[in-house]
Amino acid sequence: MSVGAGDPVRTLYRTLLAYGAFGILILVAGVAEYVHFEPFTTSATLHAKVVGVYAYDPAGKQTSGADRERFARNEDFAAVVDWSGLPDNITVEAVWFDSFENIVGSVGPGTPSRLRDQTIVTAEAPKGLKYHLPGQYIFAIERLDNGGRPVEVIGRRVVYVER
């Protein structure tokens, strides 16, 4: 049995080949873009040191106890940052995010030397609430560009507020 010139299978086959070639082209372009913007030979050279996350006394404005990863809703907590390991030619800020990605505490932006006296970054309960919302809280130290936009996370900690 011979295949005629008007066979619909040939058109479908060629269409599938065209879609496959287009898919491979998109994949190659994506890999090329990834290699260009994320070269394998370089890695992030800046790393900020988060000393720890501790219970916080708002009256005395001090941290206490051991470094922890879990807190109760009614406990105040804060991160302690060591700014001394960062060069002074960058702009940084330290930010607390709650489970809804709301900013619940921050220090900066500024150069590390300007922030040297602000080593304690507290996580505040949301406005109108007495306690922290339960869930995951992320503390991030970010490097900012000249426009004040975060371009790199150079330090990070995650803590959990339990119900």
Would you name each region that the model predicts?
Residues 1-13:
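N-terminal Lys/Arg-rich, disordered targeting/topogenic segments
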Residues 15-33:
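Hydrophobic membrane-insertion alpha-helices, especially the h-region
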Residues 34-76, 162-163:
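Short, compositionally biased P/S/T/A/G/V-rich stretches that sit at domain boundaries
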Residues 76-84:
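Short edge beta-strand/loop segments characteristic of extracellular beta-sandwich folds
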Residues 83, 149-163:
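Short beta-strand elements
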Residues 94-98, 141-143:
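Conserved aromatic beta-strand anchor motif in extracellular beta-sandwich/beta-rich domains
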Residues 104-117, 155-158:
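Solvent-exposed serine/threonine-rich low-complexity stretches and specific carbohydrate-binding patches
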Residues 112-147:
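Short, solvent-exposed, Trp/other aromatic-anchored flexible loops in extracytoplasmic proteins
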